[in-house]
From Swiss-Prot:
The active site is at residue 182. Keywords: Acetylation, NADP, Oxidoreductase, Peroxisome, Phosphoprotein. It is found in: Peroxisome. The modification N6-succinyllysine is found at residues 92, 216, 227, 234. Substrate binds at residue 169. This is Dehydrogenase/reductase SDR family member 4. The C-terminus peroxisomal targeting signal tripeptide is important for peroxisomal import. Once in the peroxisome, it is involved in intersubunit interactions.
Amino acid sequence: MHKAGQLGLCARAWNSVRMASSGMTRRDPLANKVALVTASTDGIGFAIARRLAQDGAHVVVSSRKQQNVDQAVATLQGEGLSVTGTVCHVGKAEDRERLVATAVKLHGGIDILVSNAAVNPFFGSLMDVTEEVWDKTLDINVKAPALMTKAVVPEMEKRGGGSVVIVSSIAAFSPSPGFSPYNVSKTALLGLTKTLAIELAPRNIRVNCLAPGLIKTSFSRMLWMDKEKEESMKETLRIRRLGEPEDCAGIVSFLCSEDASYITGETVVVGGGTPSRL
């Protein structure tokens, strides 16, 4: 009798966990949160911005070009989502400051930062990379996420904490031939995530990392632009398809939600089964 009662309690508890994890008991897990997403007018960034807004957040999108910002905002607002936007070149201090100020002015604070902006200005041997290319790659891909995080921390502290997600790449674990400085910069983000997580945990700010594999975007176009090349890439994946931007979005929303409140300093790989160990 006692065992039967215990089994009943366990079954009900498991059912509650299952329902919660499937979203059956709670809607809008990011309700009233304010999210900044850099490089979010196309590809992975756009999919993340859309998902955060669908899950209840007020989202501020950004990009280097006003035309792209306007188009993304119009599309997402047309879907009934709470989205605004501003131009932001993450390598420029004044643009980073404006992005933060825009969110605070419109929504009263910041709860979430998704640092997605990146460049890959070079293809070839590491021995042929110029100092100029190194500076540009590390400035945008590594230094800017660190400084962007620094800029939002005071606003997150005012709201009792927050969540940062830094977008790295499968190239951090398995370097892509020819993408030499890009590979190095994306590996550096794994260390940045760990370091920020340790430093910001006492402030109730969690920092995690997303490492997408081969996702079908304009950024990765040269890897899949013809059918033969695409089929060849699929053969290297355990899940025999290329990823879509939406494959990354739900994971980021989860990491920004209370469901991930005990997760920090971690990297989640969305790579179709691509080996991902340093």
